[in-house]
């Protein structure tokens, strides 16, 4: 197979129908037709995601053999984070995390304070036996910014925020006391209050856990020496882990995050009391318990959104297609070649292959 770039098309209107018309014209100029398409893929994390889904549907309606396949060049993690951000509280978490990272890393002096605080805490933890030594361990002394490109790592940002939580709190405390102006001090104080809230810490741990499950898969899909069979196995494992987390993981997750609350004296609400949504008026709010809100509206809801996205990107058909394609891999003298897979592959394109 040889890939060729055939052009860039300017579109004044980005509706699905307009995009479809633009593609039709581009293909027509090159003597090609949508009827000959055998696959399609898009950037699922962009702000055009809805339009691309509509475009995909239009093309499949005209040509059901133009199967959708996840674009491996685009990082799956960014797509899953984009999906999570459709949930208001997940979006608030990422927004607040970005603000904290920007404020704490706004100057070399603040970065130095953060580094010194974290190094001191690492030494203290090593002495107490709370953490152990080892190559590559305990080396994080700076916060990572979550990039908007495919190379960005939201998982690294969330993980470091948890690892360095105490040091970040210390830096914000310093800014509250010694900020150069009232605006800086006020901003740091607001971030500090938000950071030490139950809602933030709960959402931080939840998203770190969920993104952590999909992180290995996201990285595997981008490797140049991609092993499709291994990648599809990771997709299956990833779905299973998320489903297990949803079905049986609430108690262990809440116990884990409760330990973190205790360490930083963060008040845990009574889960049987009525949830108070500070973002909406009491007239519009439904009377639900804290347990229902955090378990059903956050824990279950965000996991379900991730599972739905994975199922949409890697459904039974395109997963089987990718596994069939893997048998054509020339590596190791076509070690993966499988005649039965090749026959199965041909069945997806009956117009191109005669009956066997």
Regions found by a protein language model. Name each.
Residues 1-356:
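Alpha-helical structural modules in large enzymes and assemblies
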């Amino acid at each position: 197979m040889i890939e060729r770039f055939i052009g860039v098309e300017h579109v004044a209107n980005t509706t699905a129908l307009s995009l479809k018309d633009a593609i039709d014209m581009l293909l027509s100029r090159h003597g090609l037709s949508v009827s000959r398409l055998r696959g399609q893929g898009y950037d699922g994390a962009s702000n055009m995601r809805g339009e691309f889904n509509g475009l995909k549907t239009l093309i499949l309606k005209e040509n059901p053999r133009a199967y959708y396949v996840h674009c491996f060049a685009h990082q799956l993690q960014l797509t899953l984070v984009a999906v999570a951000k459709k949930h208001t509280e997940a979006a608030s978490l990422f927004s607040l995390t970005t603000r904290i990272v920007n404020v704490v890393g706004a100057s070399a002096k603040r970065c130095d304070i953060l580094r010194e605080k974290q190094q001191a805490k690492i030494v203290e933890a090593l002495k107490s036996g709370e953490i152990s030594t080892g190559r590559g361990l305990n080396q994080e002394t700076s916060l990572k910014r979550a990039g908007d490109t495919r190379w960005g790592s939201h998982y690294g940002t969330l993980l470091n925020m948890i690892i360095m939580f105490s040091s970040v709190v210390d830096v914000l405390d310093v800014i509250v006391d010694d900020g150069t102006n009232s605006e800086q001090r006020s901003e740091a104080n607001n971030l500090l209050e938000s950071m030490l809230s139950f809602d933030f810490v709960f959402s931080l741990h939840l998203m770190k856990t969920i993104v952590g499950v999909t992180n290995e898969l996201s990285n595997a899909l981008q490797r140049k020496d991609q092993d499709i069979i291994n990648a599809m196995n990771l997709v299956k494992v990833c779905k299973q882990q998320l489903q297990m987390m949803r079905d049986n993981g609430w108690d262990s997750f809440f116990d884990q995050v409760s330990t973190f609350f205790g360490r930083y004296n963060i008040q845990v609400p009574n889960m049987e009391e009525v949830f108070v949504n500070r973002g909406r008026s009491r007239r519009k709010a439904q009377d639900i318990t804290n347990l229902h809100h955090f378990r059903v509206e956050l824990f279950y809801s965000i996991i379900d959104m991730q599972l739905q996205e994975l199922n949409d990107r890697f459904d039974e058909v395109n997963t089987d297609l990718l596994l069939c394609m893997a048998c054509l891999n020339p590596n190791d003298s076509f070690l993966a070649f499988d005649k039965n897979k090749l026959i199965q592959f041909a069945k997806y394109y009956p117009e191109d292959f005669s009956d066997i």
